[in-house]
């Protein structure tokens, strides 16, 4: 499958990226996605770890799933969530590494 690489001249790609960054710009959603980095995790465990209601976490997960940021896998009565693919995991891991780096004299 051949896909077009996003470029500054491709308005559709820019709009999609802006939507993704908008979704990830919400601190609650970002915490939820980061909870999914380590592997499949059920909604209740995400909610408990973040001290949020399961219904609120489920709402955010629906948005994140629609944007292909997370994926869901049903196992019996529970649904487990994880990051959608290596691209999403890589971007988040790289950004976490980036903010952990010393500034080396660069003004924030």
Language model feature labels by segment:
Residues 48, 59, 65-66:
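Alpha-helical residues within the helix-turn-helix
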Residues 1-16, 85-108:
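Amphipathic alpha-helical dimerization/coiled-coil segments
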Residues 63-64, 82, 102:
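Alpha-helical and His/Cys-centered functional microenvironments
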Residues 33, 66-67:
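Extended rod-forming repeat segments used as scaffolds/tethers
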Residues 12-55, 75, 79-87:
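N-terminal helix-turn-helix DNA-binding core of bacterial DNA-binding proteins
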Residues 58-59, 97:
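Intrinsically disordered, low-complexity cationic segments
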Residues 40-41, 65, 96:
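Residue-level detector of secondary-structure transition/capping positions
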């Amino acid at each position: 499958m051949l896909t077009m690489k996003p470029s500054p001249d491709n308005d559709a790609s820019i709009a999609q990226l802006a939507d993704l960054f908008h979704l990830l710009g919400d601190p609650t959603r970002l915490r939820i996605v980061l909870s999914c980095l380590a592997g499949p995790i059920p909604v209740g465990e995400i909610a408990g770890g973040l001290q949020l209601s399961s219904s609120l976490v489920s709402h955010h997960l629906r948005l994140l799933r629609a944007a292909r940021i997370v994926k869901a896998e049903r196992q019996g009565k529970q649904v487990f969530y994880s990051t959608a693919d290596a691209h999403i995991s890589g971007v988040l891991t790289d950004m976490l590494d980036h903010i952990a780096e010393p500034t080396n004299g660069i003004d924030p």
